[in-house]
Regions:
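Transmembrane alpha-helical segments that form the membrane-embedded catalytic/substrate-channel core
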Residues: 2-13, 97-109, 130-139
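Short alpha-helical transmembrane interface motifs in multi-pass membrane proteins
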Residues: 2-7, 84-92, 152-155
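Transmembrane helix boundary and interhelical loop/hinge segments in multi-pass membrane proteins
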Residues: 5-31, 35-43
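Alpha-helical transmembrane segments and their short interhelical loops
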Residues: 31, 38-124, 128
Length: 173
C-alpha cells in the first residue's frame, strides 16, 4: 500500500499543472496547489486502503484465532496484530507524504518544460520498485551483497528514500 500511494501520487501529479493550465492562465494561483491537491487525493485513497487493511488484519487474528505477538508470530514469520509501533504510523505517513509532495513538485514542474518526463517516470518507477524492499526483505539485499563482497553497496541501497519508509511499515505491520 505505501508503494501504491507513492507511485500513484508521483505519476498523477506529473500532469497536475499542465492539466490545469487554463486555471493557471486565468486566475492567479500558486502552481504548487495542483500537485499538492493530487497528493492529498491519493492520501485519501491510501487512508481508505489502510482501513481495509486494518479490518483484514483484525479479521484474520480474531475470527480465525491466529496467535499473535512476537513469540507466536515469529513461528509464522510475521506478526498478526501490530504492537506499540502502530502509534508511530501517523508520523510515518506524514514523513512519506512530505517525501511524495517534494518529488511531485519537482516532477510536475519538470513536466511543464520537458514533456518526456512522464515516459522517464514510468521507467524510473518500475526500476525503483525493485530497488525498494517491497517484495523482499531488506536483510535479503544485505546478505546478498555481503556474500559477494559488496557490503558498501548496502549503504548506497539505504539511501533510497523509500527503503527506510518501507522497512518502517514492515516493522509496524
Amino acid at each position: 500500500l505505501p508503494w501504491f500511494y507513492f507511485s500513484g501520487a508521483c505519476s498523477e501529479s506529473l500532469f497536475s499543472v499542465i492539466g490545469n493550465q487554463n486555471v493557471v492562465k486565468k486566475v492567479w494561483l500558486p502552481t504548487e496547489v495542483f500537485p499538492a491537491a493530487t497528493v492529498l487525493g491519493q492520501l485519501v485513497h491510501f487512508f481508505l486502503a489502510m482501513i481495509v487493511l486494518v479490518f483484514f488484519i483484525l479479521g484474520f487474528s480474531v475470527f480465525w484465532d491466529i496467535p499473535s505477538g512476537p513469540e507466536q508470530g515469529q513461528a509464522l514469520g510475521f506478526y498478526i496484530l501490530p504492537g506499540w509501533e502502530i502509534l508511530l504510523l501517523p508520523f510515518l505517513i506524514l514523513l512519506q507524504t512530505m517525501l511524495i509532495l517534494a518529488i511531485s513538485l519537482i516532477l510536475s514542474s519538470l513536466n511543464v518544460f520537458f514533456r518526456d518526463v512522464s515516459s522517464i517516470n514510468e521507467i524510473v518507477m518500475s526500476a525503483w520498485f525493485y530497488l525498494t524492499p517491497i517484495i523482499y526483505p531488506a536483510n535479503f539485499a544485505r546478505e546478498q551483497l555481503e556474500e559477494k563482497g559488496l557490503s558498501f553497496l548496502y549503504w548506497i541501497y539505504l539511501l533510497n528514500p523509500m527503503t527506510p519508509i518501507t522497512i518502517a511499515y514492515r516493522r509496524i505491520f
